[in-house]
Amino acid sequence: MASPSSFTYCCPPSSSPIWSEPLYSLRPEHARERLQDDSVETVTSIEQAKVEEKIQEVFSSYKFNHLVPRLVLQREKHFHYLKRGLRQLTDAYECLDASRPWLCYWILHSLELLDEPIPQMVATDVCQFLELCQSPEGGFGGGPGQYPHLAPTYAAVNALCIIGTEEAYDVINREKLLQYLYSLKQPDGSFLMHDGGEVDVRSAYCAASVASLTNIITPDLFEGTAEWIARCQNWEGGIGGVPGMEAHGGYTFCGLAALVILKKERSLNLKSLLQWVTSRQMRFEGGFQGRCNKLVDGCYSFWQAGLLPLLHRALHAQGDPALSMSRWMFHQQALQEYILMCCQCPTGGLLDKPGKSRDFYHTCYCLSGLSIAQHFGSGAMLHDVVLGVPENALQPTHPVYNIGPDKVIQATMHFLQKPVPGFEEHEDEASAEPATD
């Protein structure tokens, strides 16, 4: 095992000027955005008012302490929090014993966004650990010796692609992984999360993500999957876990991202979906809620905001003339303010909302959402909107896979050099059969 000192904090340069525009949340009229319950209190409205009060305290502290121009991403503190997490966890994480590949992914992706390199010895240790989590049946379990499950399989493949070395790629048993995906496929096009487990949109996304990254998609593996996902879109415009259920940010992201991978985005009512997701950004807090009438949560900075690049791409492909060519269809500045002011733990790590504890899950998805809010487009269309000091800028993340775009390209190029397991061999056998009259 590598010692923690094998990590070296890389402090970015600090020569650029600070952001000088006024903050959205500190406008004199911003209080008008608070909840108006028309004197009819409900459990929901009471909880919303409590959250708004805590967030107002945070906004006020910035205003009265003259810290307005000093919105700073506490990079070094987050880096040290993440570095420790790869080596040692407190007993509070005992409940995540079946999610250990997720911890690897959340931490590695957070470091990737912060542009912190992974030392070779640490990368090797992660590869060896994830190899222990791989099941002989295919796929990865939540820990060594545990049953395989699509969620930790997704996390493990993403973590290995972030490392991006031959050693990491070689951990993945593609033949067994394909067999495992087939074993979970259902006649209606959906996938089980694990043998004997539940079906929902997450499993379709996890399957599509790992299959596309590792080049194991066969002609019939996702037959009927796009149609099943489309049936999960409900009257609200968002996507539920299964057909007929309430729209939810996490399920909606999984559904649309899976359809992007399968090139079937048009299976959805995209305008209805756009209306639903843009309505989930909270007017007062600036962050996103996961469902209608729920509270703001930092993790939806990615699950909801990450939908907007996917929708932008899909609507652009349809020739929508109303699309901006310089910004996403949500308030990017307001989201950055919420994350930077309300979601940073003073000792490192990020959190759901003021008053909550930090964890690696929220650290990963708050940083991922911050990256989405900072970067529009790519190449000639790139337009950055970085709030606060210039050093707040994060590395971009791929809106479909939520790992670095360069890591997606590197992994797909690597695995495209390998045949789809069992597929080319089957084609060769078919072509070798003698012709019959």
Swiss-Prot record:
InterPro entries found in the cross-reference section: FTB, PGGT1B-like, Prenyltrans, Terpenoid_cyclase/PrenylTrfase
Site (Important for selectivity against geranylgeranyl diphosphate): W102
Residues found modified as Phosphothreonine: T436
GO molecular-function terms, A-Z: protein farnesyltransferase activity; zinc ion binding
Organism superkingdom: Eukaryota
GO terms of biological process kind: lipid metabolic process; protein farnesylation
Catalytic activity line of the entry: L-cysteinyl-[protein] + (2E,6E)-farnesyl diphosphate = S-(2E,6E)-farnesyl-L-cysteinyl-[protein] + diphosphate
A GO cellular-component term linked to this record: protein farnesyltransferase complex
Enzyme class: transferase
EC number: 2.5.1.58
Cofactor binding, note field: Binds 1 zinc ion per subunit.
Binding site for (2E,6E)-farnesyl diphosphate: H248, G249, G250, Y251, R291, C292, N293, K294, Y300, S301, F302, W303
Family, similarity comment: Belongs to the protein prenyltransferase subunit beta family.
Name of the featured protein: Protein farnesyltransferase subunit beta
Lineage: Eukaryota, Metazoa, Chordata, Craniata, Vertebrata
